[in-house]
Amino acid sequence: MTDTRNGEDNGKLLYCSFCGKSQHEVRKLIAGPSVFICDECVDLCNDIIREEVQEAQAESSAHKLPAPKEISAILDQYVIGQERAKKVLSVAVYNHYKRLNQRDKKDDVELGKSNILLIGPTGSGKTLLAETLARLLNVPFTIADATTLTEAGYVGEDVENIIQKLLQKCDYDVEKAQMGIVYIDEIDKISRKSDNPSITRDVSGEGVQQALLKLIEGTVASVPPQGGRKHPQQEFLQVDTRNILFICGGAFAGLEKVIQARSTKGGIGFGAEVRSKQEGKKIGESLREVEPDDLVKFGLIPEFVGRLPVIATLEELDEAALVQILTEPKNALTKQYAKLFEMEGVDLEFRSDALKSVAQRALERKTGARGLRSILEGILLDTMYEIPSQQDVSKVVIDESVIDGSSKPLLIYENSEPQAKAAPDA
C-alpha cells in the first residue's frame, strides 16, 4: 500500500491524477485507491464547492423575502426608536422586492417602483436604516453624497458614478447590481437656491436633480467596467436602473417652518387666530405632516418629488434614546469598546451617570448618534494607548467625572486596590 501522507510509492515518482504535476512540484500528494490528488487541486475543489454553496444560498435568500414585521424586528436590533420610519421602510422594501420577484410572470397589472425619501435630523439613523436593510436582504448597497454630484459638463462627480460604485460592490455583476439599493445622502443640499454664489457647478441645484431624476425613475446607464474615462475603448456595461431601489435622505433644516406656515390659519383683525412663536410642535412632529408641496417649496423640483412617493420621517433623538443607542443595539458602542478591551484581558464598565453625560454632550453638539463615537474615542484614547503596555490591569471603570474631565478612568488591578488619578488642570 502506498504512503498516503508523503506521496511516496516505493521510490517511484508519483503524479497528481488531476493536474499531472509531480510530487516534487507540489507541497503534498494524497493517495487513494490507484489515484493521487495534490494539495493545489484540493484547494481548487474547495473553492468550487464554496462558490456553488454561496450562489445557492444567495439564490434561496432572494426568494425568501422576510415579511414587513420581520424586517422591522431586525431593524430594531440595530436602530433605536424611529418606529414609524421602520414601519414605512419595512412595507416599502417588502413591496419593492415582492414586485421584483413577480416581474417575470405575465400579468395585466404592472407594479411601479416606490423609491423612498428619509427626512430627519443629523445623526437620527437615516444611513444606518438603509445599510441595515441592504445587509438584511443580502443585496449590493452603496452610499452617494448628493453634494458632490454635478450635471454633465461641470466640475464634480457625474450621477452615473453612483451606478459604478454599486457595480464595484458586487464585482461588476450587472444582474446583482440591478437588484441593489442606492442611498443618496444630503439630498436636501441640492435644492434650488438662487443665492448660491458657486460658479464651478450648477448654481441652482436643479440640474443635479434633473440628472438624478432620469437615474431614479429608470434608465439604462452606460458604465465603464473599470473606472472613469481613462480607457474609452472599453466596452461599456449597460445597467437598467428600473429595479434599483433608491433611498434619498436629508436633514431638510427649515422644512418644519414651511410646514408650519402652510398649516397655520391665516386671518387679520379681531377674528384672527393668535399664535405665539413658542407655541408649536417639536420638529419631528411637524415633519410628520410633510406633503409633496412642502418639499417643492423647500426647493426640490416637482418631478423629483414625484419619483419619491414613500416618505418616512425620523424623530430627533433625546437623551434617553442616545443612552439606549450606547448600550442596546447589537453594534452598540459600549459593546464594541468592551470587546476591544476584552481582547487585552481587561473588563470595561460604563457607569449609568457616564452614559447620561455622554448623551448630554452629544445633544449639546447637535450631532445626534453620529457624535457618540468621537466623544467615547476622545475619552478612552489615553487608556487604550496605555493598557496594552500595562500588566495586571483587570478592569477599567468610566464614570461621570471622566466624561467631564475632572478625573481619569478608574483602573482596577489584580489583587490590588483600584487607582484613579485626577485629570491635569487645563
UniProtKB/Swiss-Prot annotation:
A GO molecular-function annotation: ATP-dependent protein folding chaperone
Residues that, per the record, bind ATP: 121-128
GO biological process: cell division; proteolysis involved in protein catabolic process
Coiled coil: none
GO cellular component terms, A-Z: HslUV protease complex
Annotated binding of Zn(2+), by residue: 16, 19, 38, 41
InterPro entries: AAA+_ATPase (IPR003593), ATP-dep_Clp_protease_ClpX (IPR050052), ATPase_AAA_core (IPR003959), Clp_ATPase_C (IPR019489), Clp_protease_ATP-bd_su_ClpX (IPR004487), ClpX_bact (IPR046425), P-loop_NTPase (IPR027417), Znf_CppX_C4 (IPR010603)
Keywords in alphabetical order: ATP-binding, Chaperone, Metal-binding, Nucleotide-binding, Zinc
Family per record: Belongs to the ClpX chaperone family.
Subunit structure: Component of the ClpX-ClpP complex. Forms a hexameric ring that, in the presence of ATP, binds to fourteen ClpP subunits assembled into a disk-like structure with a central cavity, resembling the structure of eukaryotic proteasomes.
HAMAP family: ClpX
Protein name: ATP-dependent Clp protease ATP-binding subunit ClpX
Gene designation per UniProt: clpX
